[in-house]
């Protein structure tokens, strides 16, 4: 659907941008196993999160241009604390990196194909819109007309949709929320792509050229739903699509009617992901290959995140798994679930938790909030 905003009762000033932070916290403690991998093992030593962290952050937002201060509300502080904690938690973990060989080849081809595109459709995961955009995206697109699609809109709340719509609207970016599985928003996306590139044939006529189809490229990270959207637009399965990263490995142009050509492209990731908090979120949302991460590490971080997100909380974790979260230690929670349900297999327990999240078993959960 198009981004439709609910009325906001108290809009904040446009230039609120400065922050004064005062932070006190008891840090998590981490222990890295001293055991070494065996000769037959390609995995690094196992890493265990041992302790929890209790953080208290007071934030005052200041707008120097208008001379007054605004207190950040409790929800904003909670999210800022959580983002800070995620970065702390990931320091002890093996870095999450995934760059299969076909991506380098595809990146070169994509830059060439961009020259042919009238409009570019960037698809992101609505649960983590900031973590699912390529750092080179703006440089690649330049001044080309652009549509931002936040897919999996069925997995976030109406409030989250409104907040993200406001955030991107302020940047002048056209946003459509879609559900690639059910096709919601897909046809509206096709109409918008045609309308944005409507002047293409007008210019061609002025030059005495025949009209041609509008060319729209669909690009984005792995497994964010690019191929599924194309299949919904075409109303038949033309592009290979599956709920895992790396299925699409080659670029493919397909026709939508007489006047729109669509380019399906493989998921594009940077060669190195410097922001490991973002990398963990990619792993949680299944937007990066499974070989890139340790399931128990990622599930442990997810448990700690869910416990801190108001829409979920430790109570929801207990109600689902009948396990108390002790000391905000997600790794211990995963291990206990493994003992209770899977004969001590922590990997299977981690897989269950991640699968439950990916299937929406915890309700509408966004793992990111728009920056203040």
UniProtKB/Swiss-Prot annotation:
UniProt GO cellular component terms: chloroplast
Alphabetical list of Gene3D superfamilies matching this protein: 1.10.1580.10, P-loop containing nucleotide triphosphate hydrolases (3.40.50.300)
Motif (DARXP motif): 125-129
Residue intervals of the CP-type G domain: 107-271
Residues reported in the UniProt entry to bind GTP: 151-154, 223-228, 267
Range annotated as the organelle transit peptide: 1-33
Function field: GTPase that may function in chloroplast ribosome assembly.
Family, similarity comment: Belongs to the TRAFAC class YlqF/YawG GTPase family.
Domain notes: In contrast to other GTP-binding proteins, this family is characterized by a circular permutation of the GTPase motifs described by a G4-G1-G3 pattern. The DARXP motif is also sometime designated as G6 region.
Protein name: DAR GTPase 3, chloroplastic
The species this protein was found in: Arabidopsis thaliana (Mouse-ear cress)
């Amino acid at each position: 659907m198009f981004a439709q905003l609910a009325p906001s009762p108290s809009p904040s000033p446009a230039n609120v941008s400065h922050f004064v932070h005062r932070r006190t916290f008891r840090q998590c403690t981490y222990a890295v196993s001293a055991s070494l991998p065996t000769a037959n093992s390609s995995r690094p030593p196992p890493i265990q999160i041992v302790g929890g962290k209790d953080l208290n952050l007071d934030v005052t937002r200041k707008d120097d241009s208008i001379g007054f201060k605004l207190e950040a509300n409790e929800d904003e502080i909670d999210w800022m604390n959580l983002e800070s904690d995620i970065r702390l938690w990931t320091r002890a973990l093996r870095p999450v990196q995934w760059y299969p060989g076909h991506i380098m080849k595809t990146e070169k081809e994509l830059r060439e194909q961009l020259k042919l595109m009238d409009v570019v459709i960037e698809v992101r995961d609505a649960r983590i819109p900031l973590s699912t955009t390529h750092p080179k995206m703006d440089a690649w697109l330049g001044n080309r007309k652009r549509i931002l699609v936040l897919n999996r809109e069925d997995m976030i709340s109406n409030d989250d949709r409104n907040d993200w719509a406001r955030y991107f609207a302020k940047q002048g970016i056209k946003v459509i929320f879609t559900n690639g599985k059910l096709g919601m928003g897909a046809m509206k996306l096709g109409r918008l792509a045609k309308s944005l590139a409507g002047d293409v044939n007008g210019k061609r006529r002025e030059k005495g050229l025949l009209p041609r189809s509008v060319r729209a490229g669909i690009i984005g990270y792995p497994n964010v739903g690019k191929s599924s959207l194309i299949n919904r637009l075409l109303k038949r399965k033309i592009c290979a699509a599956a709920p895992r990263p790396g299925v699409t490995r080659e670029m493919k142009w397909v026709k939508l009617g007489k006047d729109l050509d669509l380019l399906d492209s493989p998921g594009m990731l940077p060669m190195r992901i410097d922001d490991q908090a973002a990398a963990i979120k990619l792993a949680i949302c299944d937007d990066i290959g499974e070989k890139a991460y340790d399931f128990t590490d990622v599930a442990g971080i997810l448990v700690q995140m869910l416990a801190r997100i108001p829409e979920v909380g430790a109570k929801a974790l207990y109600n689902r798994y009948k396990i108390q979260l002790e000391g905000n230690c997600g790794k211990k929670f995963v291990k206990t679930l493994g003992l209770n349900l899977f004969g001590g297999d922590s990997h299977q327990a981690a897989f269950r938790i991640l699968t439950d999240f990916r299937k929406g078993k915890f309700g509408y959960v966004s793992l990111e909030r728009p920056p203040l």
